[in-house]
Amino acid sequence: MLADLTVKDFLDKVACSDPVPGGGSIAALDGALASALSTMVARLTVGKKGYEASEEVMQHAQTITLRLLDEFIALIDKDSAAYNEVFACFKLPKTTDEEKAARSAAIQEATKQAALVPLEVARKALDMMSVIADVARLGNRNAVTDACVAMMAARSAVLGALLNVRINLGSLKDRDFVLQLQTEADTIEQTACRREKELLDAVNQDLRI
């Protein structure tokens, strides 16, 4: 599993000429990094003097971020597996008309799944952004910039994942499916960019001397 590799081994694998792990897996990794970093900020808040009123919120935030961390880690491999399935379908026999039809149907179905996996990454990363906003607002002020980096990583996860959704939609014949995912992707992107801007604008204003 990709998630079991060391950081260096993972990066070396990304840098090689194989198409996986690619951008979709990296988007999931961005989500995992956002989850881990926001968990750190929450843990730096719990039990600290002056943050007693935030204790319950931070405990709840940790529950969510740790769950999402595990889910993003699984999605790193899930995205690569989805790509490999599409690639495998293109290798199916296409000698007879029946084989051609079966191959085409298999490619379409595998491509749908290859679009749905990064959409799952984008959805989860958007959910993460709401938690990060709370962690940044109520968490340890000494770690507010860490929360901002987590927010940027989550936004990167969203945008990277949505690019992978859209490139797969381009080859699908099911127009209702395509329209549904395109509409959701556009909404997720707009919301993610707004959430990131709101937090960064507020924190940058506070940090100005």
List where the protein language model places each region:
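Short, surface-exposed loop/turn segments at secondary-structure junctions
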Residues: 48-58, 97, 144, 172-179
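Amphipathic alpha-helical interface segments
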Residues: 79, 83-152, 156
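A structural-propensity feature for long, helix-poor, extended segments
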Residues: 49-87, 188, 195
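Short, hydrophobic/aliphatic alpha-helical segments
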Residues: 2-21
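Conserved phosphate/anionic-ligand binding catalytic regions in large, soluble enzymes, centered on
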Residues: 16-37, 143-161
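A conserved active-site cap/scaffold subdomain adjacent to cofactor or substrate pockets
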Residues: 37-44
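Preference for long, well-ordered alpha-helical segments
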Residues: 128-131, 143-202, 209
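Amphipathic alpha-helix face/heptad-repeat signature
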Residues: 29-33, 61, 68-75, 114-124, ...
